[in-house]
Amino acid sequence: MSKEVIVESFELDHTIVKAPYVRLIGEETGPKGDIISNYDIRLVQPNEDSIPTAGLHTIEHLLAKLIRTRIDGMIDCSPFGCRTGFHMIMWGRHTSAKIAAVIKDSLKEIAETTTWEDVPGTTIESCGNYKDHSLFSAKEWAKLILEQGISDDAFERHVI
């Protein structure tokens, strides 16, 4: 007998969301009461645009470092296969507004001050696809996303 599985992201109506935004997808409570939260960090509008892999890859590496300097409890921040944003998994509860502020501040640093030397994990030893990076693309996309503003609501624009 197979277990019915519902994957929340496949149930989301991608035609009604308004990117860029941060959305709490859900929370799980572990056997000892620990809470893990899953966030949809949507940077571009689904089915209208996508971030090229080299730029998204560089944003991924930078966010892995930058988010951890701004908030405790990040477990992982991984890109969606559709290249419109990231899943971010966190210990504990945080408001979408708090996460949006962290993402905004991180993207601002990418856009304004990040140099190639700041990008972690860009060697053959530290990355499984080390040649597929573009700081130029990451910076340009960060600027575009910041110009649009990041909302803490996926369905109504409430820019933080």
Swiss-Prot record:
One GO-annotated biological process of the protein: quorum sensing
E.C. no: 4.4.1.21
Protein name stated in the entry: S-ribosylhomocysteine lyase
This protein's record includes keyword Mitochondrion: no
A Pfam family it matches: LuxS
Cofactor, free-text remark: Binds 1 Fe cation per subunit.
Swiss-Prot/TrEMBL cofactor(s): Fe cation
GO molecular function: iron ion binding; S-ribosylhomocysteine lyase activity
Classification via SUPFAM superfamilies: LuxS/MPP-like metallohydrolase
Subunit structure: Homodimer.
Family from the record: Belongs to the LuxS family.
Record's catalysed reaction(s): S-(5-deoxy-D-ribos-5-yl)-L-homocysteine = (S)-4,5-dihydroxypentane-2,3-dione + L-homocysteine
Top-rank EC class of the record's enzyme: lyase
Gene designation: luxS
Record's keyword annotation contains Metal-binding: yes
Domain of life assignment: Bacteria
